[in-house]
Amino acid sequence: MSNKKVLMLMSGGVDSSVAAYLLKEQNYHVIGLHFKTVSDVVFSLIPEKKKVCCSPSDTQDALKIADKLDLDDFQIVDIKKEFKEKIIDYFIKTYKEGKTPNPCMLCNRFFKFGKALEIAHSYGADWVSSGHYLIKEYSNKYSTYIIKKGVDQYKDQSYFLSYIDKNTLPKLHFPLGNMYKVEIRDIANKIGLSVANKPDSQELCFIPDNDYRRFLKENGVTTEEGKVYDLEGNEIGTHTGYMNYTIGQRSGISYYKNANVKLHVYKIFPQKNVLIVAPTEEMYSKELIVQNVNFFVDFKEIEGFCRVRKKSEEKPAVVKKIADHTLKVSFKEPIFAVTPGQFATIYDESGVVLASGVINIKEMGEV
C-alpha cells in the first residue's frame, strides 16, 4: 500500500476494531467511519432478537474504540435517506415480486465499498479498509485484482462482498483475510478492547427483531389469504399472503388435503396470490439462470463452483455466459430449493470469486 492514509469502516464490533488496531500498528493514518443506516428510534421501539449492526450501542462502541486506539479522525455519517432508497425500498420491492432479497449484498456495493470511497477521497485517503474476512490480491493467473475466500472458512465473507464493483478492488484493504476469528478475539483481549467478546451481528440492521412480516406490514405491504395448489393443480390449502413465504419453506400453510405429506413452497405467483407446493424430491434443480451479473473475471464457459445462498456450500457446476450480464449454471448434482432473488456466486477451484448475480425465476426451468 503506497498511501499511508486509510479510511476504516468501524461498525463497533470486534473485527473492525482489531483491523483498525493492526493498521495503526503498521503506522497508517487511520480515519474511522461509522454509518447510521436507520433511526435510533427503531431500536428503542423494537427489541433486538439477535445482535444486529448499526444500533445506537454500536455507535457508542465505535466511538469508544476510536478514542482508545487514538485514531486520527472519526466520523459518523448519516445515510438513512440513501439507505432507504437503495436498500429498504429494494427489500420491499423484491418481496412484492414474490422473491427473497439479500440486502447486505447491495449495502456492501453501494455504501460500505461505494460511498465510503467517496468519503475517503474527500479526506485524501486512497484506501478503504474493513474487518471483513476475505483476501484481496493481484492475480497473475487472471491479470487483475481479485477477491477470494479468507483462511477462516467459518467466517469467510467473500460471498457477501461478491457484488461489489470490481473497479474498487485496487483501493480496498482487508487486514483480517489471513487470520482466524480466535486470533482476533485474542488480540482484542490482550489490548483491552471493550468489544473483545461482543457477539457477531446476525440480523438485518433495519429489522432488529427479524420479523419480516411485521416490517412489511408496517411499510404498507399487505396481502390477503390465498390458495395453495399441488403440482397437479389441486387446491389443497390456504396461506396467509404470498409475501410471507420463500421457496423451500414448509411452515405457515393450512392444509385440508395431503396434510400427512412433507410439502415445500415450490413456486410463488404474486399477481394471483397463489403458492404451489411440492414434496421434497421435487425441490431439486440442476440448472439456474443468473442475471445482472457482476464479473470480477470475464469468461465464456468454466468449470467452477456455485453458492446460491449465504448458508450453503459451493457446489461443482459448469457455468456458461449466455449474454453480457447473464449466466447459465449447470450443477453436477441437483441442489435444493433454488430461490429467486437470492445471489449466486461463482468461484474457481482455489476460492477466487469470478462473478455474482441474481437468480431470476422468469428465466428458470423447473425448480
UniProtKB/Swiss-Prot annotation:
InterPro entries hit by this protein: MnmA-like, MnmA-like_C, MnmA-like_central, MnmA-like_central_sf, Rossmann-like_a/b/a_fold
Keywords, ordered alphabetically: ATP-binding, Cytoplasm, Disulfide bond, Nucleotide-binding, RNA-binding, Transferase, tRNA processing, tRNA-binding
Residues of the site described as Interaction with tRNA: 132, 342
Keyword Disulfide bond: yes
Annotated region (Interaction with tRNA), positions in chain: 155-157
Gene Ontology CC: cytoplasm
Cited Pfam families: tRNA_Me_trans (PF03054), tRNA_Me_trans_C (PF20258), tRNA_Me_trans_M (PF20259)
Enzyme Commission numbers on file: 2.8.1.13
Residues at the catalytic site: 107 (nucleophile), 205 (cysteine persulfide intermediate)
Gene3D superfamilies: Adenine nucleotide alpha hydrolases-like domains (2.30.30.280), HUPs (3.40.50.620), Translation factors (2.40.30.10)
Domain of life: Bacteria
One annotated GO molecular function: tRNA binding
Catalytic activity: S-sulfanyl-L-cysteinyl-[protein] + uridine(34) in tRNA + AH2 + ATP = 2-thiouridine(34) in tRNA + L-cysteinyl-[protein] + A + AMP + diphosphate + H(+)
GO BP annotation list: tRNA wobble position uridine thiolation
Disulfide pattern: 107-205
Subcellular location: Cytoplasm
Enzyme class: transferase
Protein family (similarity comment): Belongs to the MnmA/TRMU family.
Known role: Catalyzes the 2-thiolation of uridine at the wobble position (U34) of tRNA, leading to the formation of s(2)U34.
Protein name: tRNA-specific 2-thiouridylase MnmA
Source organism of the structure: Petrotoga mobilis (strain DSM 10674 / SJ95)
